[in-house]
UniProtKB/Swiss-Prot annotation:
Organism: Chlamydia abortus (strain DSM 27085 / S26/3)
Top-rank lineage group of the source organism: Bacteria
Function (record text): NAD-binding protein involved in the addition of a carboxymethylaminomethyl (cmnm) group at the wobble position (U34) of certain tRNAs, forming tRNA-cmnm(5)s(2)U34.
Entry cofactors: FAD
Record's subcellular location: Cytoplasm
Protein name (database record): tRNA uridine 5-carboxymethylaminomethyl modification enzyme MnmG
Family assignment from sequence similarity: Belongs to the MnmG family.
Binding-site residues, FAD: G14, A15, G16, H17, A18, G19
Length: 611
């Protein structure tokens, strides 16, 4: 075993979406960084759908951008269709989504990593961890190299003891075509990490030229929609394409029903729990038997390939059933399968041994991010990578940890949820998880979080000044429009009051009063409209947060002895000792902790402070 001469500040294991974000931000903060991948040709590979964003997820990507991360930038560079979802619904649930070219996404991400000062990229498969007295020292690889590091970030995705299922056939793999990582799971188990299994899946890929698009519904993109916060209109650099919608038929249901016993999921061959909000087609047919059909979305995988992703047909059926099933779908009667669908099981680590910083409680200096923490989705993984990278560097520099709160970000919601809950299914972000989602809109992420990006050294002075200028414009315009009165309809009202009417938009008001309503571009116009139209609701949510902040942010001492607090229920003592929450707010969200327990705990914390 040869030891590499550099002792890195940060070693990142895995170059998926979590690992890339962790490595990039660590290097940008001035650390010496090594990122290890078992295959450099699959850096930032989109293993499942060729898309970024969506409801809740698009909010996270905007937050990553506001903090100085790179997912938004790479998405904009490789996007081949951009949309805003839920445009007819309230502002809290509107979200950007992009169809991306899978190859271009990989190319742009790899290029960014390769050009980052202080960041070294190396091909290698990590087999074990090096630690001394529960402090991380580095990693060893299958290739016989030891790398030393002050901190290590594990972002192993679905590779830890990955097991691929296609009907009654199963074989080890991190994804189809890539080997599984077995050494890491063993290394973590030996060190006392609680590990369980989860499952996810992916649909078949088809040849576009074999599809009859004439019977499908075309779904074009929306103009001017990107992920990076910018002051100028967004013009995508790549040609834009459409997606297409079709649906299953009665024949599809019959094929699945006749072969349900051959599904790896229903045949009892899969022990891991799959994602509730992305079920397989056989799961949908069984659980929603009354539905006559299910929508299928045909999504291009790139502009230089004929392959398309069949969103909605994820399955663990054997290939012969997949073949018949595909050809029962409207427009896919002659479809040619290029890659089979499959399910994959993998190991993940329980959240009770992870701090909200994403540092392990069992080994100092070891951080975990992405699907190893039980999440599903590129966006959730990238956000965790960003947080793990920031906190790894802060640990090396002996600076305070960075933990965004759930009151100010979806990333904060996720961190809090992951470290206060035992997951029974893969964790996916959606807007309903946030208590104050009207404050956490996708359009105002830069206004909420950019000051953190600046302070961390991740956001350039120029970009921060753009965000500050936008914030100033919004505040000044809110005040000016509240003092500008015009006759509108049958009464004289302030323009701010007029904008609060449901049927009035910023654009319609600008058409009526062009001399008074200024045009700041579609993005800033929309933010200004929402800040004014929903001001009453926003103010109430801010007041509620303020009233709860004192107890929410009360810090629980690390050396508190829960077993000695006799007034706590037995379940509360067990759960608090297991999760060791850092604040009263986090403690209150642990399942099984009652309001009475929280009141007792607050008294105990205050007493502890006076001792």
């Amino acid at each position: 075993m040869w030891t590499h001469p550099i002792n890195y500040d940060v070693i990142v294991v895995g170059a998926g979406h979590a690992g890339c974000e962790a490595a990039f931000c660590s290097a940008k903060m001035g650390a010496s960084v090594l990122i290890l991948s078992s295959n450099l040709d699959t850096i930032a590979k989109l293993s499942c759908n060729p898309a970024v964003g969506g409801i809740g997820k698009g909010h996270i990507v905007r937050e990553i951008d506001a903090l100085g991360g790179i997912m938004a930038e790479v998405t904009d560079q490789s996007g081949i269709q951009f949309r805003i979802l839920n445009q007819t619904k309230g502002p809290a649930v509107r979200a950007p989504r992009a169809q991306v070219d899978k190859q271009m996404y990989h190319i742009h991400m790899k290029r960014l990593l390769e050009s980052s000062p202080g960041l070294h990229i190396m091909q290698g498969t990590v087999e074990s961890l090096l630690d001394n007295e529960n402090v991380i020292q580095g990693v060893t690889t299958k290739e016989g190299i030891t790398y030393l590091g002050k901190t290590v970030i594990l972002s192993s995705g679905t590779f830890m003891r990955g097991l691929i299922h296609i009907g009654d056939l199963n074989f080890p793999g991190g994804r189809l075509g890539d080997p599984a990582a077995t050494g890491l799971s063993l290394a973590l188990k030996e060190r006392g990490f609680p590990i369980s299994r989860l499952k996810t899946g992916t649909p078949p890929r088809l040849l576009a030229s074999s599809i009859d698009f004439s019977v499908t519904e075309e779904q074009p993109g929306d103009p001017g929609v990107g992920f990076v916060h910018r002051s100028e209109p967004f013009v995508p650099p790549l040609p834009q394409v459409s997606c297409y919608i079709t649906h299953t038929t009665e024949k599809t249901k019959d094929i699945i029903a006749a072969n349900i016993h051959r599904s790896a999921l229903y045949g009892g061959r899969i022990e891991g729990i799959g994602p509730r909000y992305c079920p397989s087609i056989e799961d949908k047919i069984v659980k929603f038997a009354d539905k006559e059909r299910h929508h299928i979305f045909i999504e291009p995988e790139g502009i230089h390939t004929q392959e398309v992703y069949v969103n909605g047909l994820s399955t663990s059926m054997p290939f012969d059933v997949q073949y018949d099933m595909i050809r029962s779908v409207l427009g896919l009667e002659n479809a040619i399968i290029t890659r089979p669908a499959y399910a994959i099981e993998y190991d993940y680590v329980h959240g009770n041994v992870i701090y909200p910083t994403l540092e392990s409680k069992l080994i100092e200096g070891l951080f975990l991010c992405g699907q190893i923490n039980g999440t599903t989705g590129y966006e959730e993984a990238a956000a965790q990578g960003l947080i793990a990278g920031i906190n790894a560097v802060n640990k090396v520099l002996k600076k305070p940890a960075f933990i965004p709160s759930r009151q100010e970000s979806y990333i904060g919601v996720m961190l809090d949820d992951l470290t206060t809950q035992i997951l029974d299914e893969p964790y996916r972000m959606f807007t309903g998880r946030a208590e104050h989602r009207l404050l956490l809109r996708q359009d105002n992420a830069c206004l909420r979080l950019s000051h953190y990006g600046r302070d961390l050294g991740l956001l350039s002075k120029e970009r921060y000044e753009i965000f500050e200028n936008q914030k100033q414009i919004i505040e000044e315009e809110k005040l000016r429009l509240s003092k500008t009165f015009k006759k509108y309809g049958n009464s004289v009202v302030s323009l701010a009051k007029a904008l609060c009417r449901p049927e009035v938009s910023y654009d319609t008001l600008r058409e009526a009063f062009p001399e008074d309503i200024r045009d700041y571009g579609s993005t800033l116009n929309a933010s200004l409209e929402m800040e004014i139209k929903y001001a009453g609701y926003i103010d109430r949510q801010k007041a509620l947060i303020h009233s709860l902040s004192k107890s929410e942010n009360m810090v629980i001492p690390e050396d508190i002895d829960y077993q000695s607090i006799s007034s706590l229920s037995l379940e509360a003592r067990e759960k608090l000792a297991k999760f060791t929450p850092r604040t009263i707010g986090s403690a209150s969200r642990i399942s099984g902790i009652a309001c009475a327990d929280i009141q007792v705990l607050m008294v105990a914390v205050k007493k502890h402070a006076h001792q």
